[in-house]
Design a protein with these regions (language model features):
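Conserved helicase/translocase motor-coupling segment
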Residues: 1-51
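Intrinsically disordered, low-complexity regions enriched in small/polar residues
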Residues: 3, 20, 97, 130-134, ...
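Intrinsic-disorder/low-complexity, polar/charged segments
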Residues: 21, 104-106, 173-176
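Intrinsically disordered or highly flexible coil/loop and linker segments, enriched in small
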Residues: 24, 121, 170-174
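Alpha-helical structural motif
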Residues: 24, 28, 60, 104, ...
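Alpha-helix boundary/capping residues
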Residues: 32-35, 115, 148, 168
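Conserved RecA-like P-loop NTPase helicase motor core
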Residues: 40-41, 45-155
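Non-catalytic, charged low-complexity extensions flanking SF2 helicase motor domains
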Residues: 148-176
Length: 176
């Protein structure tokens, strides 16, 4: 999941995977690029912009843009590069594979909203964030509500949370 879900997988042509470290990104890049029949990602171009994963001759942003323009499907691996201050309009999903419940909500939301950039070539009907740590997700949402509300009134918090979830629904898939 979610690549095993045919409906979702059609929307996941260009994705950002937020990794816990450079070594993890390097190892995952190697696994994702194995050209075996068992590898469901063998048709993806993998761009590792974590640490020394990117070539020194091009910027990480240019490397990703070039890969996207030359490939139907890409996976970008990052430990932080390209997660703030830039937009890759073609990204339709972010996979949060790093962080903890202590991950700051500002950094968390800066990263996950990378996939919400407008896209002129193909209008995005949907974009996704996949985070397999419900504690991290719910902690970030709680921090966001607390930081954007001047009161601790329970009803006001519920109203703010309801508004937030209208624009950023949070779902759980059990038994994935």
């Amino acid at each position: 999941y979610p690549f095993a879900n045919e409906t979702l997988s059609q929307s996941l042509c260009h994705t950002l995977w937020y990794m816990p470290g450079v070594n993890a990104a390097r190892c995952l890049a190697q696994m994702l690029t194995e050209q075996t029949l068992e590898n469901p990602f063998r048709g993806y171009k993998v761009i590792n912009v974590a640490g020394d994963g990117v070539s020194s001759q091009t910027s990480p942003l240019e490397e990703v843009k070039t890969a996207i323009s030359n490939n139907e499907r890409t996976i970008t691996l990052s430990c932080g590069r390209l997660t703030t201050g830039v937009s890759i309009p073609e990204w339709t999903a972010v996979f949060m594979l790093a962080g903890s419940a202590e991950t700051g909500c500002a950094h968390y939301f800066q990263t996950i909203f990378r996939c919400q950039s407008p896209y002129r070539e193909g209008m995005k009907a949907e974009c996704y964030t996949f985070d397999f740590s419900p504690v991290r997700t719910l902690t970030a949402i709680d921090q966001y509500i607390s930081n954007n509300l001047a009161t601790t009134d329970h009803e006001a918090r519920v109203q703010k949370l309801t508004e937030f979830l209208h624009y950023c629904p949070t779902i759980i898939v059990d038994g994935g």
